[in-house]
A protein has these predicted regions:
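Catalytic core of nucleotide-sugar-dependent glycosyltransferases
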Residues: 206-212, 219-245, 259-262, 266-288
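Short, well-formed alpha-helical segments that are part of the catalytic scaffolds
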Residues: 17-31, 53
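Glycine-rich, basic loop-to-helix element that forms the pyrophosphate-binding segment
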Residues: 69-85
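A conserved acidic beta->alpha catalytic loop
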Residues: 28, 35, 43-52, 70
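Conserved nucleotide-sugar donor-binding catalytic segment
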Residues: 146-222, 226-229
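Conserved donor NDP-sugar-binding/catalytic core segment of glycosyltransferases
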Residues: 102-134
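Membrane-interface aromatic/basic loop that binds lipid-linked glycans or pyrophosphate carriers
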Residues: 266-327
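Short aromatic/hydrophobic "clamp" motif used to bind/position activated sugar donors
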Residues: 90
Length: 327
């Protein structure tokens, strides 16, 4: 029987300068219909007063633990929080987003009903405050392999950790420690999914990711934004080599190459990325044949591959005028 001595869910929250968005985030956490949770708020060197805000939240609510560290990045903050987690389940979310009021309850019940190690819902971007009225549906059980393929290819799942509830011990602090600041959450998810035998997908917008005014597709990018993502994709490809996930991972890797090239082509100043762009072009040429015959690449992505390979000027125009951000 569940006792109140141990929280049912530990919610780990890296906090770095969320500003005005922290209060609505905290309200959405405290409005959860499942109330037996522990929140570990890890201040990652905030400079906007958030350190004081999380201390105040911890004084007002005994379920909240405030932790402080020098700025080390979201991955390090998550790892710090996960190491302190006491719950039977674990969820990592961001301090400027919102959760559906039934998110925790629905994901926990899905795990319990299917004896699953993982449950996840849709990851939904928003600009206006979303409606909380949607009723969570029954979950769809999946094998661990199907969940990993979904992670790589299904945009409903997204790469983020925020919409994924794990049983304690599946996602570990060591999995979260890595040298990358971009797609580090994808790498952690991929590693954790390897320990999953059964997962459950709930097809509803349970997690709402706030879209800020400045988007990567409309502002300058820095080289590590691209090189970190390429490094993470290579690690996933290497990890899948020789397994039943190899073909799926190869398709994912090719899609990532196309995405990274598209990000370079969206920039008005591209000279900084010339060396990386040459590397991407070479890998795109090498993988083109397999990509065009892959069952894991959709028609739209194959069309992008054709444009990139056969008519680069048109591909460049498409990237500049039509494409949107995709993590």
């Amino acid at each position: 029987m569940q006792t109140e001595a141990r929280p049912l869910v530990s919610v780990v929250v890296p906090v770095y300068n969320p500003g005005e968005y922290f209060a609505p985030f905290l309200a959405s956490l405290q409005a959860q219909t499942l109330q037996n949770w522990q929140a570990i708020l890890v201040d990652d060197g905030s400079t906007d007063g958030s350190a004081e805000r999380i201390d105040s939240a911890a004084r007002a609510d005994a379920r909240i633990l405030a932790v402080h560290q020098p700025n080390s990045g979201a991955a390090a903050a998550r790892a710090r929080g996960v190491a302190l987690a006491e719950g039977e389940f674990l969820l990592c979310v961001d301090s400027d987003d919102l959760m559906h009021p039934q998110m925790l309850r629905a994901l926990v019940q899905a795990c319990q009903s299917q004896n699953a190690q993982l449950a996840f819902c849709r990851f939904a971007p928003f600009t206006e405050t979303p409606s909380p009225d949607t009723e969570p549906p029954a979950g769809q059980p999946l094998s661990g392999q199907a969940a990993r393929e979904m992670l790589l290819h299904d945009q409903r799942l997204d790469y983020a950790l925020s919409n994924k509830l794990f049983r304690a011990g599946v996602l570990t602090a060591d999995m979260l420690r890595c040298p990358y600041r971009y797609n580090e959450d994808l790498l952690a998810s991929w590693r954790a999914f390897a320990a999953v035998q059964t997962a459950v997908f709930l097809d509803f917008d349970g997690y709402h990711c706030r879209q800020h005014a400045a988007s990567t597709s409309h502002s300058g990018i820095i080289l590590p934004f691209l090189t970190d993502q390429l490094a993470v994709a290579k690690l996933i490809l290497q990890d899948a080599e020789g397994t039943s996930l190899q073909a799926s991972a190869k398709a994912f890797y090719y899609e990532k190459l196309l995405y990274l090239e598209s990000m370079i082509l969206r920039q008005s100043a591209q000279s900084e990325f010339d060396s990386l762009h040459s590397t991407l072009r070479a890998e795109l040429r090498c993988g083109f044949h397999d990509a065009m015959h892959s069952a894991f690449l959709g028609t739209g992505m194959k069309a992008c591959a054709l444009l990139s390979r056969r008519v680069p000027p048109v591909w460049h125009a498409v990237c500049r005028l039509l494409l949107r951000d995709k993590r």
